Regions:
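Extracytoplasmic/periplasmic domains immediately adjacent to an N-terminal transmembrane anchor
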Residues: 1-175, 343, 368
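Short, membrane-interfacial amphipathic segments enriched in basic
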Residues: 1-11, 76, 314-325, 374
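Transmembrane helix boundary and interhelical loop/hinge segments in multi-pass membrane proteins
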Residues: 191-213, 225, 370
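Membrane-interfacial helix-loop-helix junctions in multi-pass membrane proteins
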Residues: 84, 167-171, 251, 302-358
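Long, hydrophobic alpha-helical segments
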Residues: 174, 178-195
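Junction motif at the cytosolic side of a transmembrane helix
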Residues: 2, 197, 276, 335, ...
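Alpha-helical transmembrane segments and their short interhelical loops
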Residues: 33-36, 217-291, 296-299, 342-348, ...
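Transmembrane helix segments
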Residues: 37-47, 281-321
């Protein structure tokens, strides 16, 4: 009981110390409010109001149909230009896409000559160029096919394709961006808060107090883990309910308590990583550099930004030893697909094992270095 009382009382002290750190409080509030909202809304996953110019050298019924097929919200109203103005407009950055419809285009299409339409893309606008190129191809092909169908006898297709989008029927990027922002910020804050809590002990000269107190390194670690983990657990739950469900209107298909249990297991592992990094860094700037080196690979390679199946096999195997990979997997399964414990139990078990391993490594490192931190 004495050990539990020490862990509880020192944890309350950590929470009070955090309340006096305005910079950390600002980071916490920003990460789970403004950051979540901006990740869901500022960067669209689909084409949105792309500037486009068209040089219509044919002036036919078909070319007019193509011109009129580009409209909001995917494109701005097309600007009609001449072929000579096309290069200058692209060089000046006025258009992302410039289309050149050649003379006699409709006549050649009806004659079956397969004429070419030139589509120029400003590839420096990466957020629009790749997606927009596919949009334009589909739009032009659709207009040409429907126009030609009126002049030719086309048989009905043998197969009718019905596409149904599961879990996100409207392909709304906000549904994905908001939840992934919370998942990434949970990992970031867990590492930053526990690492900075250890650095604060050194900077404030309170390590000597810990050394003379009747507490063990294990108890000190547990203090950092439960106090900082509780903060992240509470604010992430509030952000999920208030920001994602409330402000963004994203439907949560699965059990929020089950997801929060997964958050707790992930925090056990990531807070241990934070303590390990806190024993290596000698100051807050050093901790910040270490966080950048560790956090970016964890977020980019965990399967949240890019499907793991698209990565090299060696990277997939290495990332299986990281807690974020399994946390992202269970979070997406629960929140997006409504998975129950019978589906995600293996990720829970793996997180427990990885958390235990990281905790043991951090504890050994902490025991070895606590005497030199004073």
């Amino acid at each position: 009981m004495r050990h539990l009382r020490n862990i509880f009382n020192l944890g309350i002290k950590e929470l009070r110390s955090l309340l006096g750190d305005k910079a950390m409080l600002t980071l916490i509030v920003f990460s789970f409010t403004v950051s979540v909202y901006s990740s869901a809304t500022v960067t669209p996953g689909s084409l949105n109001l792309a500037p486009i110019a068209i040089a219509d050298m044919d002036q036919s019924q078909l070319s007019n149909r193509i011109v009129n097929s580009f409209y909001r919200p995917w494109f701005l109203p097309p600007e009609m230009i001449t072929a000579d103005e096309m290069d200058a407009g692209l060089d000046a950055g006025r258009y992302t896409f410039a289309i050149n419809i050649p003379p006699n285009f409709q006549r050649d299409v009806l004659a079956g000559r397969q004429p070419d339409i030139q589509v120029n893309v400003d590839a420096t606008r990466m957020s629009q160029a790749f997606t927009g190129n596919g949009y334009i191809q589909n739009i032009i092909n659709g207009e040409v096919n429907s126009f030609v169908a009126r002049y030719r006898d086309n048989s009905e297709p043998l197969v009718s394709l019905e596409t149904r989008m599961r879990f996100n029927p409207n392909l709304d990027p906000a549904w994905f961006g908001g939840v992934m922002a919370i998942i990434n910020n949970i990992t970031m804050l867990a590492i930053v808060l526990t690492g900075s809590a250890l650095i604060r002990e050194r900077e404030h000269g309170t390590v000597e107090h810990l050394l003379v107190m009747p507490i063990t390194p294990f108890e000190i670690m547990m203090v950092k883990i439960w106090s900082m983990g509780l903060v992240v657990l509470v604010v992430s739950g509030l952000s999920l309910v208030l920001m994602v469900k409330g402000v963004l209107g994203v439907p949560i298909e699965g059990s929020i308590p089950l997801f929060m249990l997964g958050v707790a297991l992930s925090l056990f592992a990531t807070t241990s990583i934070g303590i390990f990094m806190g024993t290596i860094a000698r100051s807050m700037p050093q901790l910040g550099l270490l966080v950048i080196l560790v956090l970016l690979p964890l977020q980019m390679l965990s399967g949240g930004s890019t499907p793991r199946e698209s990565m090299p096999q060696m990277v997939q195997d290495i990332m299986l030893t990281m807690p974020t990979t399994h946390f992202v997997s269970l979070a997406q399964a629960i929140l997006y697909r409504g998975a129950g414990f019978e589906i995600v139990w293996s990720q829970f078990l793996t997180l427990m094992a990885i958390g235990g391993a990281f905790f043991t490594i951090a504890l050994l490192r902490f025991r070895k270095t606590i005497g030199t931190m004073a």
